Amino acid sequence: MGKVIGIDLGTTNSCVAVMDGKAPKVIENAEGMRTTPSIVAFSDDGERLVGQPAKRQAVTNPERTFFAVKRLVGRRYDDPMVEKDKKLVPYKIVKASNGDAWVEADAKTYSPSQVSAFILQKMKETAEAHLGAKVDQAVITVPAYFNDAQRQATKDAGKIAGLEVLRIINEPTAAALAYGLDKAKAGVIAVYDLGGGTFDVSILEIGDGVFEVKSTNGDTFLGGEDFDMRLVSYLADEFQKEQGINLRNDKLALQRLKEAAEKAKIELSSTTQTEINLPFITADQSGPKHLTMKLTRAKFEALVDDLVQKTIEPCRKALKDAGLTAGEIGEVVLVGGMTRMPKVQEVVKQLFGKEPHKGVNPDEVVAIGAAIQAGVLQGDVKDVLLLDVTPLSLGIETLGGVFTRIIERNTTIPTKKSQVFSTAEDNQNAVTIRVFQGEREMAADNKILGQFDLMGIPPSPRGMPQIEVTFDIDANGIVNVSARDKATGKEQQIRIQASGGLSEADINKMVKDAEINAAEDKKRREAVDAKNHADALVHTTEKALAEHGAKVEEGERRAIEDALGDLREALKGDDAEAIKAKSNTLAQASMKLGEAMYKQQAEADAAKDAAKDDVVDAEFTEVDDDKPKKSA
């Protein structure tokens, strides 16, 4: 078995590491750098450039230079965040045949997985040159908040690059592995990971070689690229005020602004003022124009303050989900290049009440952790156990459009859970299983991952068939769902495929809006529950009335029929209180019917007892009260 490498496939930069004996080692690329820009370009003659060579020619070739493509992985073309990106990047983002966002150069389109694969190939070649041997297996990191489709797309990228991806590992978890491998001290740590394109926070408990993730949260569209773009917008606005020329219409100028913004951002982490100087940025009838501007750290911090503040809420939610307070966190580990920014460090210190740990290299720590996990899988690293979690709840749509969770968020993976559901109609011979991911009460408000049909259910009254739905999440966080009719043994399963990722509006909407809209969600959920209860009451009352209606007086029967009519009418609307009231009226009216049924049964039993000489003790068996839930 050859060496298994660890790769941090980043939005802005990527890094590769390998276990060198007992210690992980970051490998330098052909340019002598320990990190490689996650940039792919195509030259005039069609040559593909990756990394530093691609970055060097970006200013003169902006339309064929792809950067930050990781942010498009698993995203739909009509995603609001893609719309935003389209206005800011100089290259062309196009709509693929499946509705995903792809990129285009020289009339040829590339999926984000393909572009990621070009970067992975570069990392693979870097490792092979260092090791002097072929490499075909890797552990690749992804943001903790990546969904199933995005993880699958990352595995696909590895495959395209000629790598068997042994494990997909979350970036904050990898960082924790690197931080805690040689530390004997047990405790709880928080990993604050603000990278080039994504933000993650994970709370972990470390002790005796066990790294257990307690909770995770994040934002898949928040990172250094947003800070750069905020500064680009400011520079473009200021230039337009002074010169009356909109640089956003000039792709060459836009690329120069992007490079200048990134450079200024980095410089302002170690100095309080920098100068941006871009001669001949554009020209008009009066001649060439130059952009010269002094930028202070205070001004830059004011421009991006809301972006820094956006990291606070996910941290609070992660603490809440872990059942911990900020004071119970022993150490805060900073990961990602953006954590070098003094303002970010200040916010982290205020939030957790302690100085963050700066003993790890934020650009390399994730790749080092991936290499350690590779060593664990290869057997080179002993006594290390990694227990990660799934970031969002998974479940199916049930009667009335309700989202029924089968696996809750922050459940340790790998995991497998089943739940029994039933049919909603008499003689229903098929059910559609619609799989969702999110935190809202109604399925439609969450992200649909896929759907499939279970056919051939034997004709029977509703509520009778038992359909067992099983969710299986592997250690990579990739989902398999199966449904089985317990009576016939017929089974259907689906591996959720990457048909488009969770957008910013989708992912964050799931968790953030869940709290904002909690009251509305509760109201809608109550309405559905009331309807389901009322529907069942109508069904059982109609059946009882047909079988035993003759045993009650005419006036009582008419009262039941009137109450039935009123409830049916109420069911046409969505007023939960009205449905509950009409349900109670019907339940009261039906009591006489129930009494008549019990009376008849009691008389029959008495007749049987009279015919017997001996009294025989009854045998009791325990009955499971859990009735199957109804599925659409």
Curated annotation (Swiss-Prot):
CDD domains: ASKHA_NBD_HSP70_HSPA9
Name of the protein in its database record: Chaperone protein DnaK
Modified residue annotations for Phosphothreonine: 198
Family per record: Belongs to the heat shock protein 70 family.
Record's function text: Acts as a chaperone.
Keyword field: ATP-binding, Chaperone, Nucleotide-binding, Phosphoprotein, Stress response
Domain of life, source organism: Bacteria
Alphabetized Gene3D superfamilies for the sequence: 1.20.1270.10, 3.30.420.40, Actin, Chain A, domain 4, Substrate Binding Domain Of DNAk, Chain A, domain 1
NCBIfam families in the record: PRK00290.1 (NF001413), PRK05183.1 (NF003520), prok_dnaK (TIGR02350)
Database matches in PROSITE patterns: HSP70_1, HSP70_2, HSP70_3
InterPro entries associated with the record: ATPase_NBD (IPR043129), Chaperone_DnaK (IPR012725), Heat_shock_70_CS (IPR018181), HSP70_C_sf (IPR029048), HSP70_peptide-bd_sf (IPR029047), Hsp_70_fam (IPR013126)
A Pfam entry, by short name: HSP70
